[in-house]
């Protein structure tokens, strides 16, 4: 008989659907409660609006990280594991991969325009993010009757493995929920957390697998995808009896120590105008360039630029100066 594993992953910024009315930057109240209520109303209105396209969540998110997430199911076939996929969304809260959602922009990543904590200064950003997640858990969401928190998943499946794959910014938001969920499991060793770059969190350290950029060469892909690629490796290679926090921490801790040091690049920062000129010249030579490929080339040429900044500059030039149909601008 196959063994069920509940997998919780965080959403991605890249999506197949867009909707300007569902961008958190447009809900600028400095009061958390007011902002959340306005956001919730907008989502409910979108659900009732037949002109706004909705898709299953699994098909809304995209990008290299999400491509790996979509391989989780096939990765478990030979191990006779059955997975149930859940998504932590800063916009919709906890949803299943089958939940019908619209395109939206909301995130717990503090550097972005649609950050949950942006513009709210009454308390610390960490507390704001926790409060936002708590508010989302109390909303019915797009699937009536389905779990709206990680704790609710555990209460429904107390004996099953819970694998949480997240970024550090999302770990902070869902931290209280995770601590409560851990205590609700029949065996706390069944909670496994993979959060690249985050080694410890109070009360959860015994559940957190070691994962950082040293795994990149072994797992392949971008460094930022190490957490989902490690999850894929575990799902495809480990027998169900070995998927518990204690065994995996020991095994992958030793494996991580065997990896070469993280490569350091001595790349040069240049002014924004020079970055734009670089993008412009390359697009003039090749109109089929994607932002992803051009950023890779830019870095290979010895220059440094954060992904989101480069993408924004790329899209700005694309829209204003070239009016080109760029095939792929996701990272």
Where are these regions (language model features)?
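DNA-recognition alpha helix
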Residues: 291-303
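A structured, charge-rich N-terminal accessory region that forms the first stable segment of a protein
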Residues: 1-59
